[in-house]
From Swiss-Prot:
Tree of life domain: Archaea
Similarity-based family: Belongs to the eukaryotic ribosomal protein eS17 family.
Organism: Methanococcus aeolicus (strain ATCC BAA-1280 / DSM 17508 / OCM 812 / Nankai-3)
GO MF term list: structural constituent of ribosome
Name this protein carries in UniProt: Small ribosomal subunit protein eS17
Lineage: Archaea, Methanobacteriati, Methanobacteriota, Methanomada group, Methanococci
UniProt xrefs under SUPFAM superfamilies: Rps17e-like
InterPro entries: Ribosomal_eS17, Ribosomal_eS17_CS, Ribosomal_eS17_sf
GO CC terms: cytosol; ribonucleoprotein complex; ribosome
Keyword vocabulary terms for this entry: Ribonucleoprotein, Ribosomal protein
């Protein structure tokens, strides 16, 4: 079984996908850079978790 992401990570990721869907891709590294530019996220670890969630959401949209 996989790990469950915390609610605030999901909420932040869904807000970012809603606002910046045109800038986000299915590539994790690109999404990290975009999130750095558009969002105020306190730590690198939290940014990476949000970027991973956003990447997963974008892959579902493409499928």
């Amino acid at each position: 079984m996989g790990r469950i992401r915390q609610t605030f990570i999901k909420r932040a990721g869904e807000d970012l996908v809603e606002k910046y869907e045109d800038r986000l891709t299915t590539d994790f590294e690109t999404n990290k850079k975009v999130i750095d530019e558009v969002a105020e996220i306190a730590t690198k670890r939290l940014r990476n978790r949000v970027a991973g969630y956003v990447t997963k959401k974008m892959k579902k949209v493409d499928a």
